[in-house]
Amino acid sequence: MEPERSLKLSIWEGVLAILFLNWSTGVIVTGYALALGASPQALALLGALPFLAQLLTPLALFLRGSRKALAVRLNFLARMLFLPTALAAFLPEGLRVPTLLLFAGLSQLLAAPVGVLWLSWMADLVAEERRGRYFGFRNALLGLVGTLGNLMGGMVADRLPPPLGYQAVLLVGVGAGLLSVLLLRLQSEPSESPSPPARRALGIAWQDLAYRGYLGLVFLWYGAVMVGGPYVIPYFVQVGGLSMTEVGLWTVISASSGLLFGPMWGRMADREGHKAVLFRTAMVAALMPLLWLSGSRAFPWPVWLSAIADALAWSGLGTALANAALAHAPKEARNGYLVLFWLALGLGGLLGSLLAGSAASLGLGPSPYHFPILLSLGLRLGVALRLRRL
C-alpha cells in the first residue's frame, strides 16, 4: 500500500542512481581527469560543477507539470548528456579535459532543478515524524552502495590501462542511472498543495529572517568545505600513496561505518531536532582535515582513520542540513524555501572551489593540496562554531 510501496521503490531507485552520481561526480571522474592530465585548477573546476549547477535550481519554480514527470525527463536527459565524457580520451590531448568538463557540466546543469522537485515530492511521501529515520537509513545505505561501487570501479580502473578502466566504469554508471529513471517512473506522487507564483514563493522564503540567517550558514559551510574538497582524492593518491583500489576501500570503510552512524543521527534528529545533529556533525567534519594532513606514504594510518570520521560527520550532516530547511518551510511555499537552500549551497560551493584553485596556485606547502586543505580546516571550524547558535 502507498506510500510504503513508493518508499521502498525509492530506496532501490537510489541504489542505482547513486552509482551514476558517485562515479560521475566523485572518485572515478576525478581519477579519469587525472589520467587525462587535468591541472589543479581543472580539478577545482570539476569539483565546482555540482555547485555551479545549483545556480539553476530556481528553474524548478517556473517548470509546470507533475514533479514526477519533470524529474524523470530531466534525469533521463542528464544521464544521456554525460555519455560523451567517456569518449573524451579519444580526442586530441588539448581537447580531452575541456570536453570532460563541458559535458559533465551540461549534464549537471540539466539535472539541477531535480533536487528541488524530488525533495518536495519526497516531503509529501514521508511523514514529518519519520523523516529523520527514513532518510538516515536511506542515505546510509546509499552511501554504502555508492562506495562499494567506488571500490569496484577503482579495481577496474587499476587493472585496465588508463584511461580505459575509467571509461568502462563511467559507461556502466550511465547504464545504472538510466535504469534508476525507470524505477523513478514507478513511484506514486501525492497531490501537490497549490503553490504561490514563483516570485511570491521566493519572496516568502526570503522575508523569513530566521531562514535567511540559516541560508547564510549553509553558504559559508559549503564554501569552507570546497576550499579543500576538490583536492582530497588527489591528496590521497599523490601524497598518501593510495591506489584507486585503496581509495575505493577507504570509501567502503566510510560507508560501512555510515550504516551505523546514519540511523543514530536520524534517531537523534527525531528526538532532539535537526539543529542538534548539525552542530555535532559539523564539528567532526571541521576537524577531519587534521587526519588527512597527518597522513603520508610512510605514515598512512591517519588517512584510513579519517574514513571513520567521514562517516561520523556526513552520515548525519547532509540530511540534517536539508531537513532543517524543510522544518523552516511552510508547506504552501516549500519550493521557494528549497530553491533558496540549493542556491545557498551552490553559491557557497562555487565560491569555495574558486578559492581552492587560487589557494593551490600559490605553491605553498609540500604539494599544491596542503594549503587549500589547511585553509578549509580553519574555515570549517569557524562556521561549525556558529552553527551552535542556531
Describe every region a protein language model picked out.
Residues 1-56, 61, 210-251, 322:
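Helix-loop boundary and gating motifs at the non-cytosolic
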Residues 81, 96-114, 300-317:
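Hydrophobic core of transmembrane alpha-helices in multi-pass small-molecule transporters
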Residues 76-94, 283-298:
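C-terminal ends and interior cores of transmembrane alpha-helices
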Residues 65-80, 137, 162-164, 271-283, ...:
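Cytoplasmic membrane-interface "Motif A"-like loop-to-helix N-cap segments
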Residues 1-4, 189-217:
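Juxtamembrane intracellular "pre-TM" segments in multi-pass secondary transporters
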Residues 111-126, 316-330:
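Intracellular juxtamembrane helix-capping segments at the cytosolic ends
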Residues 155-175, 358-378:
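A membrane-interface helix-boundary motif in multi-pass transporters
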Residues 56-70, 157-158, 261-274, 360:
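Helix-to-loop junctions at the C-terminal end of transmembrane segments
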